[in-house]
Structures are given as C-alpha cells and as structure tokens.
C-alpha cells in the first residue's frame, strides 16, 4: 500500500492578480501569483523521499479553494531507459540515468470528474490542470529567494500567430471505411476482456536546430522532453495505452539526416534513419522527431496505421510553442495517426471539448480523444495486431511498489485487470489481484479460457530460418522467450549466416531496394567501395567516409545487377542524401566463405560474435 502524503499550499487570502507578465509560456495577460508552502504529514520517524509517491495540494483558483491530488507517474520511464548525445567530434555517448525517484506526476481535482493534471514537481510546480472545463497552467516565477508561482488560463497566453496550424496528414474518413454513426463507435467488452492495456515504448529524438534554440543546454532539453512525455502518457491512459519513454536521443553535434521544411521529405528520411540506425541499437516501438525548423504549412506529420513498422512507426513534430502542453498534444495527435487514428469528422465528439484529432490545433489544446478516435485506434489494434505494443513489462521491470488495480502485473500479483468496476477478465478477482478458483491463468499467449494452452501449441511464429517458432509448454500462460539460432550458423543452403534471427544475404537486400529481377552484382562492381566517396566506402568515422580495404569491399555499399525489363545495369547502387546508410551491406551479411560483415570489415564468422 502506498502511503498517501498530505501537502498543503498556503496562499494569501487574496492572491495577487497581475495584468501582464512574461513567463516561459510567453506573454500572459492575466494571472494570479501564489506562494506555496509545503507541509508533509509523515509517520513519526519516517524518512521522507525526495519525491513522494502521492501528494495533495490545497490552493485557491479565482478565489475558490480547490484540492489537487497527484500521484507519481511510475510508468513514465522504462527500466532500461537510456539517453544518447554526441561529442563535438561525433562520438556517440549513451548513458543510463537512474530514473526511479523522478518528479513527474498525474492528477485530478477533487469533485471534478472531468479534471486532469500533469505536473512536474522538480523545481516548484510546473504543468497544467483542467478545472471546470478550463485549462490552467502553473509555473514557478524566476525570482531570487522566492517561492512565488503564477497560475493562469491558457486562453490568456498571447499567441504569436493566430493562423490555423495544421497537421500534414491528408487522409480522412473517406479514405478509410464507410462512416459509422457515433453511437456505433464503441469497443466491445469482449475486445477489452482479451485486450487490456497496450504498451508503446517511445524514443524521442531532438534535432540540432532545437539544441541551438536552447543554447546547447542539454539539461534544459531533457527536462522539456520529460514533461512532454509525462503529458502524452497522461493523454493515452484514457485510450488504455501506456506510453513509456525508453530513450532520448539528442543530435547535439549535427543532424543525422537532412531536416528540411518539407515535412514529407523529413519524415521519410527520419523513418529510414530509424529503420537502419536507431532500431539496431535501441529496442523501441515508436520514434518521434522534434525539430525547431519551421515546417511548410504544417506543425506535424506521421504515417497512418504504421505502429511497429520499422520505418513508418514514426512522426515529426515542430517545436511550435513554448507551452509544453501544446507540443505534447501535437505529439499525441501524430502518434495517434501511427495507431491508425484518422482526423475527426462532424460525426465525432468528445463531450463539450475540442478533440485531439482535429486536422488543425484547437484554440485551446485538448487532452481528449473523440469516440471516433477510440474506435479507430482499437479497430486498428484488433484487426492489424501490431505485435510490438502487446508485450507487457515484466513485474520485475516496473519501478514501483505493486498496486492492485493498475492493470500492470507486478510482483506478488497473479493477475491485475483494473478496478472491480472496470475489470473484464473472467479469470481474475479484481479486488485481490488473485486468480479465481479453478483458474490457472488470467492472461498470456498460452492462456485459453483461464487454462494453460496444450503443450505444443504454437504461440510465436517463425520469422525466418534463423528464428524458430515457440510453443506453449502446457505448464505456463506465457510463451517461452523468443530465441534465435546462434549467430554465425549457416542458413539458406549456406548462402548466408544467421544474425539476430535473420539470414541476411545480398540478394534479399537487392530485392528490398529495387524489386524483382535484381540480383547481387559481380565482384568487380564492389571494387568501387575502395574510392571512399558517396557511392563507395565501408564506414564513416567522425563524418569522413572511410574507403574499404580490398578484402572488405563486400562490406561497404551494396551493388546489384538489374535484369528487370528495360533495364541493363550491371552495377546498380542506391544512394540518398537524406539517409546515406541506406543501401549499405547489412551487418552479418556473408562476404566470403566463412566470413561476415562487421562494422565495415569482412571478418571470420568464428570470431565475429
């Protein structure tokens, strides 16, 4: 049981009201100044943590007392959360900061069922809360030896540009399916019963323009990214989706792609970079690029219905506003497209509020998805089955004490289907998080009607010759761990060697780049990799293209022979300014008998792994 802590904010009886002030959010025309005083009610002798698990604030807004309940967002970071930036000479620097005792909270207002809150308590209180249908922002004032905070409505922040800001996605409901009436747009109890929370493992990427905009202050950028992720996590909880930040990458020395105002170009380049670079070194489900470049006529763009795709599970967001809430809503919107959600039409509603999936950003940013969005999202999940977001964090990976009713299976729990009011799992006792009498299991790929699946039932299909299928044991609800054949084991009749569950060979890589009737080129074509220029090199060091040694030429740029109709190109290669890595021979590819490519070298398979 989490000890609930009581914190009071003491204000003057008549809080100061100002007419205009410049804050981080911009020029604010009407605001209140409050002076928080923190009083913590802890048991005698208890050690106070730096950031409590739960807090309660009492404050006055517009002269009326309100009570703000806050709980630490313990699903914000994954246990393997990492941060990457680059030294001035281009060296990749990756760290794994401790994130257990962070300072990011979600909450609500007492006696206001529609209220929400997303607050950072790192240095004072900063964030937003919705009260009686209106959005308020709070932030500490930068005054020496003062705990003064400003509270103000979003509508009182001066907007630099009142022109509508659009999402770049042009698909609409007409490109999807016949429109269903709003009353039909529901997810059935059966869907929820067998499909509880999904888990999106998110990586945020910050471009060089944002680094420059923030005067190379990486700590400031990190704090902003944490606050954005906290709000996105809050928004998606109501869609039964947990968004966990698993990584942050800051292009501190230079952009890793060419970031252009043309949003389609930049999104394509970012997707290719994610596929060929980021995914090879960081496991995640979705990546979003934040840029300070002014995108042409749009503030965001994403692929639709693309979650889990190596290239297209991506979006780009312009750092359009200093207000974190605004940018977080744009991010939630673009990620919504990745989850199969289209722009709202006139049939769609989210009560009295504007909805997140409007084609243009609303005058007041909304934190609510419409009924159409809810249906769209779960229709995509149920029918397209994006498998990467199904994996639930292991109980030992969750950085928090176990809490029955949060829909996360934690240490000491046999099941967790949410609160008794919301539980749709016939196998689980929601009050105790224990299995009901006669039940062997309550979830898992090897659980059918509360019983373990029969031994030998396939629970994970083979993806290649190097990735055998997994089968249920008959003794557990969980599918056995995904295992691959040993790296270096011959595959495809000795045309290749296994590498991380795949059998990479040049023929398949040529096919992926150019289509049918394209094959591995003759050896003479690969000799061009000794040039050390854009169409021939083995690897890059400090931004320089390193020519291949004669014995390594088949581990540089890929050359293919095009025999397709109307083509006669014996040395065809692929090169793109937006992604120089695309078109290179993949790691683990056979480069000679008994040898594979590793970091631009052709090395003995016996010593490569």
From Swiss-Prot:
This is Zinc metalloproteinase-disintegrin-like. Its EC number is 3.4.24.-. Its cofactor is Zn(2+). One of its GO terms (cellular component) is extracellular region. It comes from Crotalus durissus durissus. Residues 401-487 form the Disintegrin domain. Its main location: secreted. Residues 1-20 form the signal peptide. Residues 21-189 form a propeptide. Residues 198-393 form the Peptidase M12B domain. Ca(2+) 3 binds at residues 467-468, 470, 482-483. This protein is a zinc metalloprotease from snake venom that possesses hemorrhagic activity. The active site is at residue 334. Expressed by the venom gland. Binds 1 zinc ion per subunit. GO terms for molecular function: metal ion binding; metalloendopeptidase activity; toxin activity. Glycans are attached at residue 371. Belongs to the venom metalloproteinase (M12B) family. P-III subfamily. P-IIIa sub-subfamily.
């Amino acid at each position: 049981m989490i000890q609930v802590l009581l914190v009071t904010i003491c204000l003057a009886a008549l809080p100061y009201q100002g007419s205009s002030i410049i804050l981080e959010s911009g020029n604010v025309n009407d605001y209140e100044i409050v002076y928080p005083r923190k009083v913590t009610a802890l048991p005698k002798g208890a050690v106070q943590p730096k950031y409590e698990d739960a807090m309660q604030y009492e404050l006055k807004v517009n002269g009326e007392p309100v009570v703000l309940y806050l709980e630490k967002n313990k699903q914000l970071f994954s246990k393997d959360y990492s941060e990457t930036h680059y030294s001035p000479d281009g060296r990749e620097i990756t760290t794994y900061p401790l994130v257990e005792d962070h300072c990011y909270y979600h909450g609500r207002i007492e006696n206001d069922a529609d209220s929400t809150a997303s607050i950072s308590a790192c240095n004072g209180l900063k964030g937003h809360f919705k009260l009686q249908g209106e959005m308020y922002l709070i932030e500490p004032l930068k005054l020496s030896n003062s705990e003064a905070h400003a509270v103000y409505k979003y509508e009182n922040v001066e907007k630099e540009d009142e022109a509508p800001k659009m999402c770049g996605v042009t698909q609409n409901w007409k490109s999807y399916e016949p429109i269903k009436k709003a009353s039909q747009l529901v997810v059935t109890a059966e869907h929820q019963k067998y499909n509880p929370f999904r888990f999106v493992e998110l990586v945020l990427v910050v471009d060089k323009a944002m680094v420059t905009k923030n005067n190379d202050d990486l700590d400031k950028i990190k704090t902003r990214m944490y606050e954005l992720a906290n709000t996105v996590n809050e928004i998606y909880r109501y869609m039964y989706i947990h968004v966990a930040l698993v990584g942050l990458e800051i292009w501190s020395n230079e952009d890793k792609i060419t970031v252009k105002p043309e949003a389609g170009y930049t999104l394509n380049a970012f997707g290719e970079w994610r596929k060929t670079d980021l995914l090879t070194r960081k496991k995640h489900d979705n990546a979003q690029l934040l840029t300070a470049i002014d995108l042409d006529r749009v503030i965001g763009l994403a692929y639709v219905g693309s979650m889990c795709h190596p290239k297209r599970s991506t979006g780009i967001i312009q750092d359009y506003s200093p207000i974190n809430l605004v940018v977080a809503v744009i991010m939630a919107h673009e990620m919504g497209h990745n989850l199969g959600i289209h722009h709202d039409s006139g049939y769609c509603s989210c009560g009295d509020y504007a909805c997140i999936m409007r084609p243009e950003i609303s005058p007041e940013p909304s934190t609510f998805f419409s009924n159409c969005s809810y249906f769209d999202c779960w229709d995509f999940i149920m029918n397209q089955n994006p498998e990467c977001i199904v994996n639930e964090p292991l109980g030992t990976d969750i950085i928090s004490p176990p809490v029955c009713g949060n829909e996360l299976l934690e240490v000491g729990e046999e099941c967790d289907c949410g609160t008794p009011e919301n539980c749709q799992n016939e196998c689980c006792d929601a009050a105790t998080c224990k299995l009901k009498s006669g039940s062997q299991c309550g979830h898992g790929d090897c659980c059918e009607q509360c019983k373990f699946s029969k031994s030998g039932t396939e629970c994970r299909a083979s993806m290649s010759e190097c990735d055998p299928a997994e089968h249920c044991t008959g003794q557990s609800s969980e599918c056995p761990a995904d295992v691959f054949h040993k790296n270096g084991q011959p595959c495809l009749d000795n045309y290749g060697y296994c590498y991380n569950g795949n059998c990479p060979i040049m023929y398949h890589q040529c096919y992926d780049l150019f289509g049918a009737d394209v094959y591995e080129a003759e050896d003479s074509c690969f000799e061009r990799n000794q040039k050390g220029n854009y169409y021939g090199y083995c690897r890059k060091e400090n931004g320089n293209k390193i020519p291949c040694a004669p014995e390594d030429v088949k581990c540089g740029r890929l050359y293919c022979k095009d025999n397709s109709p109307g083509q006669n190109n014996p040395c065809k290669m692929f090169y793109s300014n937006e992604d120089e890595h695309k078109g290179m021979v993949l790691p683990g590819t056979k480069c000679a008998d008994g040898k594979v490519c590793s970091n631009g070298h052709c090395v003995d398979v016996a010593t490569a792994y």
